[in-house]
Regions:
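OB-fold/S1-family single-stranded nucleic acid-binding modules
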Residues: 97-118
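Short nucleic-acid-contacting surface segments enriched for D/E, G, S/T with interspersed K/R
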Residues: 75-90
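Short boundary/loop segments of OB/S1/cold-shock single-stranded nucleic-acid-binding domains
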Residues: 22-34
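N-terminal export leaders
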Residues: 4-8
Length: 118
């Protein structure tokens, strides 16, 4: 028998799913006052959903730079080849409030082109 307690448990579990997705995909966790403006080679990268990711080294620390979803990257003209390891990019990004080595890119410059990611 489906009781009120079962209903409340199910409703609580289902309501947590959008919050978890928002925590990952929402940009409120990034501090627009803490900007990274860095030019350097890509150490490694992923070009896959939920979003592309660059890994770059600055002052001996590996930084994780989250990009837009691949559909947006493609629509804006940023290919997997553009962010391949060894490519030199300029990245303008905001620091994550909880992890100082994670950033969200606002834009990247590659081969003289600036690609806005928002």
């Amino acid at each position: 028998m489906f009781t009120r307690r079962h209903f409340l448990a199910a409703a609580g579990a289902l309501s947590a799913v959008p919050m978890a997705a928002q925590a990952h995909h929402g940009w409120g966790g990034f501090d627009r006052e803490k900007v990274l403006d860095h030019t350097g080679p890509v150490a490694r990268s992923t070009y896959a959903n939920p979003h592309g990711t660059l890994y770059m080294v600055k002052d001996g620390q590996e930084l994780t730079i989250e990009l837009a979803p691949t559909s947006r990257l493609q629509a804006r003209g940023l290919s997997a080849e553009d962010v391949a390891p060894g490519k030199t990019l300029r990245v303008y990004a905001y620091q994550n409030r909880g992890n100082p080595n994670v950033y969200r890119a606002e834009w990247v410059e590659v081969a003289g082109r600036r690609i806005e990611l928002r």
